[in-house]
Amino acid sequence: MAAMLGDAIMVAKGLAKLTQAAVETHLQNLGLGGELILAARALQSTAVEQISMVFGKVQGQDKHEDSYATENFEDLEAEVQFSTPQAAGSSPDFSTASSLDQPLSSSLGHAHREGPAPAYVSSGPFREAGLSGQATSPLGRVNGRLFVDCRDLFLANSIQRRFFHQDQAPVGGLTAEDIEKARQAKARPESKPHKQMLSERARERKVPVTRIGRLANFGGLAVGLGFGALAEVAKKSLRSENSTGKKAVLDSSPFLSEANAERIVSTLCKVRGAALKLGQMLSIQDDAFINPHLAKIFERVRQSADFMPLKQMTKTLNNDLGPHWRDKLEYFEERPFAAASIGQVHLARLKGGREVAMKIQYPGVAQSINSDVNNLMAVLNMSNMLPEGLFPEHLIDVLRRELTLECDYQREAAYAKKFRELLKDHPFFYVPEIVDELCSPHVLTTELITGFPLDQAEGLSQEVRNEICYNILVLCLRELFEFHVMQTDPNWSNFFYDPQQHKVALLDFGATREYDRSFTDLYIQVIRAAADQDREAVLKKSIEMKFLTGYEVKAMEDAHLDAILILGEAFASEEPFDFGTQSTTEKIHNLIPIMLKHRLIPPPEETYSLHRKMGGSFLICSKLKACFPCKAMFEEAYSNYCRMKSGLQ
């Protein structure tokens, strides 16, 4: 009889354990963790005590069988143990209530010393603001979401001991209001930190360093495109016109099959450097300019390139920072969380616990800019993928010079510091701080920021999207007409929005360039005339700026004037300008073939990067379907410029 009761005790206690685990799991799935889980554990411990009381007398009658039952229960407990066991000598003291209130990041800090969770989420400058009294350790914040199981299970073991041996009054104080607060905190979307992650399609592939190695990749691409075009012709599946009846500029070649598009992307992601940068420039164009399918393929190029192997990456760091660069870090994540055309970005943590982002340049890209551009243009021209005149020789020369400057990370660091100073008091924009001790010509280290790129901001409210886009356009005008220095790369990923602090972080100042006042004095008058829809004034200033010679055919002159006036429509509108429904890109798309065919002289060199930034900013507004009046922002910029100019005279 005693043996049977011993077995019953073992089974009952085991069922209580399993019930506890099931209840906790269900509560977590419902998003009702925290206090409710503590209450569930209290009920479980009470149930176990009641079981012991019921069978207590029988247990007392037979000590041997009681010992047998206890031993078997401990065996069962070991098999279904859902708590994280503590290392010998490392168990925290739960004798006081205060020990339970310590931040979990400190309790688990030693266990994670080799590295944080995939914490491309930082406590960061945004996260620290307004969070006094909370743990600043990124592990404390990240573990709250990514490691909820580990944390709760760690506490399960310790709190269970507390309930068996200590007063249960704190749990008894749980109220309906506490439960509701826990539920709301769980459901609040802005409480979730945002992290940047490498594209799932990104692969580890060695960067070809030598010119011969890079040329071989372009040669293989050319051969592959040729066979792909033959297959496309054989299938008679040339691109059809889109639903609006117009064809994209790049939608005119049998070389532009789906298979060939994948070949292009694969090659660009492997060689990286200047060739990939050109592909990224095409990726941020509107669908009216390039084939929509190719735009989607290039989207993968824009989001993430492939990343270099550990050995190649380590060699770059050793060459630039010396063999002991790791001594300056507490932790370094060997797999990057972002990869782009010129470099890849790794998470690291300084000795003091501050998280940083280390951008490491791919080896050989700076030395191969000229050959890469020549090779890619040869392949694209051979396949007739680009319309004649789209990338004339003078534009290629400008791109070469810009890419050479972008490869100088020390120059980029200097401009990042300049913009950080210019925008230090701005309520909406933020520039991450440079970590000088981990910077070199090929390594750039900044504080880690939080948020997500603007291509993921389409789900935000209309009010927030309007504010983001409004500030971006105002910044463009200030960069050109107030700062006289502009970050000219409008890539989505260079703008990170943090919903918790309602700020946008500005990244990547490699494409920054300065503008002389002699240029801006004329250019602001062109924009003034466009905002006034003054056709004659636009023509006069365009000739003065050498956009035109004055001897162009009428078709070219009209196309140029129309394009300028179309861009000025937004600044001419006192009413909210709906970027989501405007037809600016389509109108300009229709003018491109005329301007490519009849242009007599190239436009001023400054306008390539300037129009890339302005056009990209308008495209951001279009993609986010922003709607707000723009006339006042330009009028303010114009008034400030004139006032500043008169003050200098």
From Swiss-Prot:
Keyword list, A-Z: ATP-binding, Kinase, Membrane, Mitochondrion, Nucleotide-binding, Transferase, Transit peptide, Transmembrane, Transmembrane helix, Ubiquinone biosynthesis
Residues covered by the Protein kinase domain: 330-519
Motif AAAS motif in this chain: 338-341
Superkingdom of origin: Eukaryota
Pathway(s) per entry: Cofactor biosynthesis; ubiquinone biosynthesis
Activity regulation information from UniProt: Autoinhibited by the N-terminal domain, containing the KxGQ motif, that completely occludes the typical substrate binding pocket. Nucleotide-binding relieves inhibition.
CDD domains: ABC1_ADCK3
Interval spanned by the transit peptide: 1-163
Catalytic residues (UniProt): D489 (proton acceptor)
GO cellular component: extrinsic component of mitochondrial inner membrane; mitochondrion
Residue ranges of the TM segments: 215-231
Subcellular localization, as worded in the UniProt entry: Mitochondrion membrane
Chain positions of motif KxGQ motif: 277-280
Principal location listed in the UniProt entry: mitochondrion
GO BP term, example: phosphorylation
Record's compositionally biased regions (Polar residues): 84-108
Pfam families (alphabetical): ABC1
GO molecular function: ADP binding; ATP binding; enzyme activator activity; kinase activity; protein kinase activity
Subunit structure as annotated in this protein's UniProt entry: Homodimer; homodimerizes via its transmembrane region. Interacts with the multi-subunit COQ enzyme complex, composed of at least COQ3, COQ4, COQ5, COQ6, COQ7 and COQ9.
UniProt note: domains: Adopts an atypical protein kinase-like fold: while it adopts a core fold similar to that of well-characterized protein kinase-like domains, a number of features are positioned to inhibit the kinase activity: (1) an atypical AAAS motif in an alanine-rich (A-rich) loop that replaces the canonical glycine-rich (G-rich) nucleotide-binding loop and limits ATP binding by establishing an unusual selectivity for ADP and (2) an N-terminal domain, containing the KxGQ motif, that completely occludes the typical substrate binding pocket.
Function description: Atypical kinase involved in the biosynthesis of coenzyme Q, also named ubiquinone, an essential lipid-soluble electron transporter for aerobic cellular respiration. Its substrate specificity is still unclear: may act as a protein kinase that mediates phosphorylation of COQ3. According to other reports, acts as a small molecule kinase, possibly a lipid kinase that phosphorylates a prenyl lipid in the ubiquinone biosynthesis pathway, as suggested by its ability to bind coenzyme Q lipid intermediates. However, the small molecule kinase activity was not confirmed by another publication.
Protein name stated in the entry: Atypical kinase COQ8A, mitochondrial
